[in-house]
C-alpha cells in the first residue's frame, strides 16, 4: 500500500525496498501511490529470498521516474491494498485509494504475476535505485 511518510523524515528513509518519495499533482508527498513487492524462495526450507518490486502504483501522466511500471490510462492505479491468488495462479489486487481521487480508481485488478527478475534496475525521481518487475501491458 502507500506510505505518505516515506522519505519525509529520518525514521522512514527511502531504500531499495521503499524507493520513492515524490509529490503528486494533488499535493501528496512520500510514496503516495504505493507498490507491491514480489518475493521468491528457492524452496520451503529457504532462509533467504530474492525480491523485486512487482508493480508501482502511479497516475499515467506522472513522469517515467515516478510511473516506473509504465502505467497508462487503461491500467493506472494507486494504493494496492489486498491481494489473493486464485487456483489458476492469477493475482487479484484490490486498491483502496485515497490519494488518486480525481478519477474512480478503487478497483479489483487481475494480474499475471510473472517471475522475480523479469524486469530490471530502475531509478526513482529521488535517485534511489531498485529492482522492478517487467513493465505493465494492456494484454
Predicted segments — roles?
Residues 1-139:
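Sequence/structural signature of beta-propeller domains
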Amino acid at each position: 500500500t502507500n506510505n505518505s511518510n516515506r522519505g519525509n523524515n529520518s525514521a522512514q528513509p527511502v531504500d531499495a525496498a521503499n524507493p520513492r518519495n515524490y509529490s503528486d499533482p494533488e499535493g501528496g508527498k512520500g510514496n503516495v501511490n504505493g507498490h507491491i513487492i514480489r518475493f521468491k524462495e528457492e524452496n520451503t526450507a529457504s532462509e533467504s529470498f530474492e525480491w523485486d518490486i512487482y508493480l508501482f502504483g502511479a497516475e499515467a501522466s506522472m513522469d517515467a521516474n515516478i510511473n516506473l511500471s509504465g502505467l497508462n490510462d487503461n491500467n493506472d492505479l494507486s494504493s494496492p491494498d489486498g491481494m489473493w491468488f486464485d487456483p489458476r495462479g492469477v493475482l487479484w489486487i484490490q486498491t483502496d485509494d485515497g490519494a488518486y481521487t480525481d478519477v474512480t480508481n478503487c478497483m479489483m485488478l487481475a494480474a499475471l504475476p510473472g517471475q522475480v527478475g523479469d524486469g530490471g534496475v530502475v531509478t526513482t525521481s529521488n535517485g534511489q535505485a531498485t529492482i522492478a518487475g517487467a513493465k505493465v501491458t494492456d494484454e
